[in-house]
From Swiss-Prot:
The active site is at 27, 45. One of its GO terms (molecular function) is acylphosphatase activity. It comes from the Bacteria. This is Acylphosphatase. PANTHER family: ACYLPHOSPHATASE. The lineage of its organism: Bacteria, Pseudomonadati, Pseudomonadota, Betaproteobacteria, Burkholderiales. Its EC number is 3.6.1.7. Belongs to the acylphosphatase family. It is an enzyme of class 3 (hydrolase).
Length: 98
C-alpha cells in the first residue's frame, strides 16, 4: 500500500465541547484518551468556557473519541458536542494540549 493510500484513510475533525468542561481536567483527560486511541491533533480551552479540539486519525478511532467526548472525564458535565470534518493536507505528529 502506498503512502498516498494510507493518507486517504486519515480523517481530520474539528470538535467543540460545551458544558462544564473547564477546570475539571477535561483537556488532560482528552490527551490521555487520544494517546490511547493513537490519534493526533490538539485540544484547547476557549474564552467562552468551551473546549475545542482538532482530531486526526482513522475514522473508527475518531468515532470512539467522539463517543468519549460526549461524557468526558468524571467531573465534566458535557451538554453538547459538535463536530465537522476538515479537509487538510497537514498531518499532526502527536496529540497535545494547547
Amino acid at each position: 500500500m502506498s503512502r498516498n493510500e494510507l493518507d486517504e484513510r486519515i480523517e481530520t475533525y474539528y470538535v467543540r465541547v460545551r458544558g462544564v468542561v473547564q477546570g475539571v481536567g477535561f483537556r488532560h483527560a482528552t490527551v490521555r484518551e487520544a494517546h490511547a486511541l493513537k490519534l493526533r491533533g490538539w485540544v484547547a480551552n476557549l474564552e467562552d468556557g468551551t473546549v475545542e479540539a482538532m482530531i486526526q486519525g482513522p475514522g473508527a478511532q475518531i468515532d470512539r473519541m467522539l463517543a468519549w467526548l460526549r461524557h468526558g472525564p468524571p467531573a465534566a458535565r458535557v451538554t453538547e458536542v459538535t463536530f465537522e470534518e476538515r479537509r487538510t493536507e497537514k498531518r499532526f505528529e502527536r496529540f497535545q494540549q494547547q
